[in-house]
Amino acid sequence: MKQNYFYKSRHELILSPSEEESSPYLHRFSHQLPTELIQSFGPTHISLPFPLHLSILLQEKHVMTAKTEIGWLHQGIEKAFESVPWKMAPSFATRINPIVPAPIALGFVLSLEKILHIDEKIPKLAQDYRLLMLECARIFHHLRIIHQTVALIAPYALIQFSAHTLSQAKELQTSINYDQNNYPRWEIGGITHPIYQTWIREFQKTANATSKAVHLLKRSVLEESQIQKRLTGIGVINKENALSFGITGPCLRACGIGDDLRKSHPYFNYFSYAPTIFTQKDGDAWSRFKIRLNEIEASFNIVQKIIHALLQEIKNADLISIPNMFEQGDAHSVPPGMETSHIESPEGELAITIVSNGKDVPYRVRIRTPSFFNAAAISAFLKNADIDDIVLIILSLGITGLEVDR
């Protein structure tokens, strides 16, 4: 008869009464039983936010080490840029993050405008509209991470409410574009279509309704003790390790370092709106969760300021974009040069370097995504964690798979 037995530690077996009676000799060999186990996790798992393979060394239920293997979504997109015409390249760049494509697309546009020496000539109306897209992308991305976390550990009613709030944020993001997953309103030199007061008023109503829903969600989430209990003390990293891994964004600010490119190196028209920077000291998943909640409300404050500015600018605006060579056709060469733009995406610093050799396609494109550095630090975040907390910790990092596997 097959006997099933389990053990708590090297010297303690958990046996049924019949096993205790029939197999006393097992105690003599208990010191030979293994206490460590290598568990393979991924690359495809229903609870993982993106394809990722983890080789985890477990001691009982605790993670001792975790080796990360990426590349399951590899696109070779940086090499593919070398055959994409300049005018199509910003839209092509959105494949790196199709969930919130505005930062990557506008970062590419900014680098290209620097090569063309038109980055300081962009009309203020167009710059403010670009900021509106970036802040709506930040709101949707953070709400998406919050909903995925709440869906794992919160009561059913709160899960439904967070899903409804997320759908409102998606509608807000979609309303500033002509489709859900691309951004056809922007172009090199400005934006493509004029903006009307009637549209601004409708967008303002949608933003106000979403802001109220987010405020209620934040209050409900902070009052739910179960969420705080599960997230507090897991996935901890100190500021020294965070800096050594190159981590930026909410994960770095959760360690107490208030670094944000919107304030330290403002681009477009951010210097007019002075975004609020939130920090925490504990560096755990709960700290990252609270920072996202606070940044959503701060983004809504910026959105309201931009709306009021747009209503004034529409009356006096003569240009929504400056004339440039890309308006005359698709196949145009760009002067030789190399420029880099830095954007504060929802997860941290996004840097895009473009090299032109004077032809009609890029010579070289190099993209620094924050998710890649967060994924590289997964082993540090998981060290000494409980096996039940692995998915929650990875979710708290806000990693986008396609940003990792470029």
Describe each model-derived feature in a short phrase:
Residues 2-406:
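Active-site bordering "gate/hinge" segments
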